[in-house]
Amino acid sequence: MAHEVVVVGGGIGGLTAAALLAARGVNVCLLEKESRGGGCAVTFERFGYTFEAGASLYASWQPEEIHARIFAELPVEQPEVRQAAPAYVVRLPDKTDVAVTGSVEEFAETLRAAFPECADAAVNFYREIAPVGEALRRIVRRVPDLRTASFSRRMRASLPEARVARRVLAALNHTAAQHLAKTSTRFRRFIDVQLQIFGQRESNECAYLYATVALMLPLWGMYAIRGGASGLADTLTEAIKKSGGSLRFNAPVLRLAYDEAGRALGVDLLSGERVEATRAVISNLTVWDTYGKLVGASRTPDNARRRIKDLGGWGAYLLYMGLDEEAAQRLPAEHLLTLTDWQEGQSFNPEGAQFMFGAAPEWDTRAPAGKRAVTVSTFTEAEQWFSYHEDESEHEEQDQRTLELWWERMHAIMPELGSGVEMIETASPRTFYSYTRRKLGMVGGIGQSPDVFGLNSLTHRTEIPNLFMVGDTVFPGQGVAGVTQSALIVANEIAPLSKG
């Protein structure tokens, strides 16, 4: 069977690319090994609860942002979203709560109260990043494919931002820490936990320009989606169907198929069937799995092999819980980003010090009456979950130890919970691997350090003719909004919208 475009993988990136192409009249077929779309963002049900697989906060749902741009093309309404107020609260080890919300000037008063030891430096840091982040946001609106756009297109997009252009150019290779010199350890850790959750790098490693956008996201507005990320995935699935696209679930792909010139001409399924693509194949796998599994080690170009050899990401260990409504009302926000240890005198290590507590919103509890679904997200080194074990009982013991550790930390930093929370289930990198087949179950993309950020990032293009990539390991990177933008970039390259 032949199509113009074949999409491998039904994560948010693959679904968005397929939905856009189908809406533009392209004969597209999406292949997904699971029974529904969503990838590592899919929700799951247990005992009357519907759990999200991550932090459950989503950026860029404002009218002029990426999601509105996508749904303006699609034959369906976007899922219901509501802004979280505040976006979240950062809770520090001394029990200081910092509500991240409001305009920069409104937030300045919050910073002064929370960080009196370096109030002016903290406020000045945010006043410094705000115009840079806003400028980068506007530039990417004008040129979504900034990473691969021509020099002239980049310049035209940047001209209206002349006031901050010099600052942007001067900071291209800076880390966020280089702009925190006069701040306290308390404030730096406040920044570290946010950069870690949004960019998988703390301030000493995170690209400054990435930080200017990431730290402004909650002030611009973060949103909850009805039904979680699966609400978005299901809506995109409906859009593909309405536009005449083909969806094939429970259809695992084995490898890429090539013509005599080495161009991608389709894919071979595990069943032995070949699905041909006359224009392009789009991989919604990670960059490691695109080359390691889809392309194949023997056909992976040397440049690509060298580039991805030392790239890595974090794994996630998640706790899925039920929360009494009475306990939920005692919390300062539905999302708490918590720091449990200052880790003074050492480099920041998120594995032992931070977690995100995310409760389903009151208007979409995803739980039995009087309850709310909760996902607690923590960082973990993925590889340790795949190291040699004598038998499965050792994995179970590792899971139990990790659960007990985070359960104790959670109750210590969030005493409001009391007995109003119960454990339902856990997930480790092994869980994510079993469902998504992502390398080592790593989720969240590649850490946004200067060497892999922006113009140094991996692009949607590959060295295999007719093969493209979407997802969180290519430009622009992390988050549902970033993945969605990567899909728009690929759709625009394969089937650009007519300017007429």
Question: Positions of the model-derived regions?
Answer:
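A glycine-rich dinucleotide-binding beta-alpha-beta segment and adjacent secondary-structure elements
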Residues: 186-201, 215, 415-476
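N-terminal glycine-rich phosphate/pyrophosphate-binding loop and immediately adjacent elements
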Residues: 2-141
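A conserved beta-strand/loop element that lines the FAD pocket in flavoprotein oxidoreductases
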Residues: 240-253
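C-terminal segments that line or cap access tunnels to active or ligand-binding sites in enzymes
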Residues: 324-430
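Active-site-proximal substrate-binding core of FAD-dependent oxidoreductases
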Residues: 258, 496-500
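A conserved FAD-binding loop/helix module that cradles the flavin
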Residues: 55, 472-494
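Active-site/ligand-binding neighborhood in enzyme catalytic cores
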Residues: 130-243, 435-450
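Mid-domain catalytic core of redox enzymes
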Residues: 252-369
